[in-house]
């Protein structure tokens, strides 16, 4: 009897031992599966790229796939939000987006200074408005400065934050257009800029705002900057204080009446480039930054348009660091050569950036 009891106890212990081993093996299996899942999760997380706002402009956060209805808006908003650290532009979805601050016109509090200020032109200003001339060797890329403005004039430009050339240590170029938008070339020009993903600055006057607001809206929608070119394209160097206000503030008022959702207008270019310290100071009091140019050519005579290939060669010979290029859209030559010109400038190692890149 004792023998059978002992055998029963021994058999029962064996069963418990086997059950315990099974339980341990099962628990080990569960831990292994859990560990594998954790490792897989960590590996997946490493593949998610999240940009730091300090890493650069225009780099987007990698997001889960968005719906068609909201993806473009969300990406544009993300890019605009990332335009920080002193930058007011970003690049997203093949175009530039801007986060412009409202312009301050606090300088109007001291507008009385303008009544007694001299309206004389700069001593070194010729009949046309060029701040200097450069010649580039297209084989070596070496740029020679043929002539430049006087030290006094350059100091005056700097005093009022006037743009005529960007950072001369960087291979970068800025495209600007003046007037001539009513010659039927704008759709082609905008198509080319969109294809090449280039942002330009368009300085507009009152006639164009009134007659072609749809084209201006397209410029805004496709990542371009709109600048103030005054209402009537007068020479502003000798006008009265009231006339200057009517021309410059009047253009802005017309602009917002026509396009109430347009972004702030920050840049001003004097009609025909006619300029003196009085104009620069007045524009500065209105909160504008005046934009001139460091390269242009005679492209505005619609009855004597230059050859495309010769003009491309001229463009490349004049190419220089920080170049602010002036083009007129009424030019058939410009319209035809624009795409090739952009390619050649980039092939030479230059970036083409929005004018707001200039600090």
Predicted features along the sequence, with ranges:
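Catalytic domains of cell-wall/extracellular-matrix polysaccharide-remodeling enzymes
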Residues: 102, 188, 210-211, 234-359
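Active-site beta->alpha N-cap acidic-glycine motif
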Residues: 135-237, 243-265, 357
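Sec-dependent N-terminal signal peptides of Gram-positive bacterial secreted proteins and lipoproteins
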Residues: 27-48
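N-terminal pre-catalytic segment of deacetylase/amide-hydrolase enzymes
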Residues: 45-175, 182-187, 195, 350-359
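N-terminal secretory signal peptides that target proteins for export/translocation
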Residues: 1-25
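Short stretches within intrinsically disordered, low-complexity N-terminal or propeptide regions
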Residues: 10, 36-38, 78-82
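Serine residues within intrinsically disordered or low-complexity segments
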Residues: 10-13, 19, 32, 44, ...
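Alpha/beta-hydrolase fold active-site neighborhood
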Residues: 30, 56, 230
């Amino acid at each position: 009897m004792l023998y059978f009891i002992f055998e029963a106890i021994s058999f029962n212990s064996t069963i418990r031992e086997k059950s315990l081993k099974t339980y341990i093996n099962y628990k080990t299996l569960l831990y292994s599966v859990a560990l594998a899942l954790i490792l897989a999760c960590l590996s997946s997380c490493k593949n998610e790229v999240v940009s730091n706002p300090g890493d650069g402009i225009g780099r987007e956060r990698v997001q889960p796939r968005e719906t068609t209805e909201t993806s473009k808006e969300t990406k544009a908003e993300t890019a605009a939000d990332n335009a920080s650290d002193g930058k007011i532009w970003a690049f997203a979805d093949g175009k530039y987006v801007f986060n412009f601050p409202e312009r301050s016109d606090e300088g109007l509090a001291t507008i009385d200074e303008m009544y007694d200020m001299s309206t004389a032109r700069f001593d070194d200003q010729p009949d046309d408005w060029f701040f200097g001339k450069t010649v580039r060797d297209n084989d070596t890329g070496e740029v020679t400065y043929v002539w430049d403005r006087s030290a006094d004039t350059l100091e005056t430009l700097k005093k009022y934050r006037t743009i005529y050339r960007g950072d001369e240590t960087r291979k970068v170029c800025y495209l600007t257009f003046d007037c001539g938008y009513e010659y039927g070339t704008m759709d082609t020009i905008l198509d080319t800029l969109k294809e090449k993903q280039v942002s330009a600055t368009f300085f507009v006057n009152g006639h164009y705002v009134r007659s072609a607001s749809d084209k201006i809206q397209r410029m805004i929608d496709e990542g371009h900057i709109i600048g103030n070119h005054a209402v009537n394209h007068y020479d502003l160097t000798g006008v009265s204080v009231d006339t200057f206000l009517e021309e410059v503030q009047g253009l802005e008022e017309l602009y917002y009446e026509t396009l109430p959702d347009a972004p702030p207008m920050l840049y001003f270019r004097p009609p025909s480039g006619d300029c003196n310290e009085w104009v620069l100071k007045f524009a500065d009091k209105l909160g504008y930054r005046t934009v001139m140019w460091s390269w242009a050519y005679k492209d505005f005579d619609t009855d004597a348009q230059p050859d495309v290939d010769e003009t491309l060669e001229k463009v490349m010979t004049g190419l220089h660091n920080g170049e602010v290029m002036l083009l007129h859209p009424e030019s058939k030559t410009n319209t035809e050569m624009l795409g090739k010109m952009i390619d050649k400038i980039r092939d030479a190692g230059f970036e083409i950036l929005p004018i707001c890149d200039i600090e």
